[in-house]
From Swiss-Prot:
It comes from the Bacteria. FAD binds at residues 10-15. Belongs to the MnmG family. TrmFO subfamily. Coiled coil: none annotated. This is Methylenetetrahydrofolate--tRNA-(uracil-5-)-methyltransferase TrmFO. GO terms for molecular function: flavin adenine dinucleotide binding; tRNA (uracil(54)-C5)-methyltransferase activity, 5,10-methylenetetrahydrofolate-dependent. Keywords: Cytoplasm, FAD, Flavoprotein, Methyltransferase, NAD, NADP, Transferase, tRNA processing. It is found in: Cytoplasm. PROSITE patterns: GIDA_2 (PS01281). It catalyses: uridine(54) in tRNA + (6R)-5,10-methylene-5,6,7,8-tetrahydrofolate + NADH + H(+) = 5-methyluridine(54) in tRNA + (6S)-5,6,7,8-tetrahydrofolate + NAD(+); uridine(54) in tRNA + (6R)-5,10-methylene-5,6,7,8-tetrahydrofolate + NADPH + H(+) = 5-methyluridine(54) in tRNA + (6S)-5,6,7,8-tetrahydrofolate + NADP(+). It holds the Pfam family GIDA. PANTHER family: GLUCOSE INHIBITED DIVISION PROTEIN A (PTHR11806), METHYLENETETRAHYDROFOLATE--TRNA-(URACIL-5-)-METHYLTRANSFERASE TRMFO (PTHR11806:SF2). GO terms for biological process: tRNA methylation; tRNA wobble uridine modification.
Length: 444
């Protein structure tokens, strides 16, 4: 086995972060990426760390678990966080990025790093020539997926997720929508398409009866809740969407609103939110409207939304299969394979769900691969931190019921002592403890 470099397979968010962290520690990296030679069903470019679903890194507040995770990653010099900050677009209290500018920045930095050799091509075998980080993502090629599944006795898990449509802003009827963030948090960053009860019921009927694109007959539908197709959500009940992406709470009509409304109500019956998708502000995505409807049906149904009667869809929603591993049985908390300590895994394939979480797992795997290379012991981040709670969750949960997981305060170790009843105060206390513990851990 070579002790002159480390392999990183896959240049998505996790692989890009892992490669950066390894090279930062003075170790040569061979970074393999098949895009540019072979396409995936979902990616649009050959850029590293491409965002294929939303352009949002979600909430930025420390009272939000993903906001805490991002702050921890900033303190660990995350390339994904740094590039994201440099290419932010308005999103109220959330962190959203210009997906093209951000991905190009990550790609350029890694390609120009003298310690990183970028190799474009498909890897079909698990390498055994050097310490290796596999971060090929939920869209892992079939050939390599077979080898990874063999580690689990041939048992593979999978689920479907979907991407939301993107709209040309110039085709939105601005007379029927209004600019506002929920509860007026941060700047008014979302375009809101309000619906009356009558409009919502007609929309719900059209959505639940629209024709979906076919699935392969051998693949069972198994959705991750965080990226569920809107039509699947709608079929769960007439009001399900009203507690999800079409929730109207905190999105009151502006004083000068002259469109239709239900009586004297100050809040619409339902709201579809559109979020800026690029730095120029010319594209908007439909928040929470991941879908697997046929493209013609998407146009017909979504043009029923007030303000979108003549909307031009620059990208229709699509759905794809996402594979993930039996991490509780296959991985250590360091993201090392239980069967081979020279093999690391990172990203959504490990069962962490979300852009930020994927990058965080790559950060941990990259640090530990570098430590192993140098003959040092792999580290386990404190379970009191967000970045420590994720690897603990995916490697310690019940394998029989293992599902992909976003970071949340429920998986971070509880505070000691008397429970703080106020949720905001409790989350603030957890965040304060997490950052203190991370600092102490890094200085130990």
């Amino acid at each position: 086995m070579s002790q002159s470099y480390i392999n990183v397979i896959g240049a998505g968010l996790a692989g890009s972060e892992a490669a950066y962290q390894i090279a930062k520690r003075g170790i040569p990296v061979k970074l393999y990426e098949m895009r540019g030679v072979k396409a995936t069903p979902q990616h649009k470019t050959s850029n590293f760390a491409e965002l294929v679903c939303s352009n949002s890194f979600r909430g930025d507040s420390l009272t939000n678990a993903v906001g805490l995770l991002k702050e921890e990653m900033r303190r660990l010099d995350s390339i994904i966080m740094r590039a994201g900050e440099a290419h932010r677009v308005p999103a109220g209290g959330a962190m959203a990025v210009d997906r093209v500018g951000y991905a190009e920045a990550v790609t350029a930095e890694l390609e120009n790093n003298p310690l990183i050799e970028v190799i474009r091509g498909e890897i079909t075998e698990i390498p055994n020539d050097a310490i290796t980080v596999i971060a090929t993502g939920p869209l892992t090629s079939d050939a390599l997926a077979e080898k990874i599944h063999a580690l689990n006795g041939g048992e593979g898990f999978y689920f479907y997720d979907a991407a939301a449509p993107i709209i040309d802003k110039s085709t939105i009827n601005m007379d029927k929508v209004y600019l506002k963030s929920r509860y007026d948090k941060g700047e008014a960053a979302y375009l809101n398409c309000p619906m009356t009860k009558e409009e919502f019921l007609a929309f719900h009927e059209a959505l639940t009866t629209a024709e979906e694109a076919p699935l392969n007959s051998f693949e069972k539908e198994k959705y991750f809740e965080g990226c569920m197709p809107i039509e699947v959500m709608a079929k769960r009940g007439i009001k399900t969407m009203l507690y999800g992406p079409m929730k109207p709470v905190g999105l009151e009509y502006p004083d000068d609103y002259k469109g239709p409304r239900d009586g004297d109500y100050k809040t619409p019956y339902a709201v579809v939110q559109l979020r800026q998708d690029n730095a120029a502000g010319s594209l908007y995505n439909m928040v929470g409207f991941q879908t697997h409807l046929k493209w013609g049906e998407q146009k017909r149904v979504f043009q029923m939304i007030p303000g979108l009667e003549n909307a031009e869809f620059v990208r229709y929603g699509v759905m794809h299969r996402n594979s993930y591993m039996d991490s509780p049985n296959l991985l250590k908390q360091t993201f090392q394979s239980r069967a081979n300590e020279n093999l690391f895994f990172a990203g959504q394939m490990t069962g962490v769900e979300g852009y930020v979480e994927s990058a965080a797992s790559g950060l941990v795997a990259g640090i530990n691969a570098a430590r192993l290379f140098k003959g040092e012991e792999a580290i386990i981040f404190p379970e009191t931190t967000a970045i420590g709670s994720l690897p603990h969750y995916v490697t310690h949960t019940d394998s029989k019921h293992f599902q992909p997981m976003n970071v949340n305060f429920g998986i971070i170790k509880e505070l000691e002592g008397k429970r703080i009843r106020d949720k905001k105060e409790r989350y603030e206390a957890i965040a304060e403890r997490s950052l203190k513990d991370l600092e102490a851990f890094l200085n130990s």
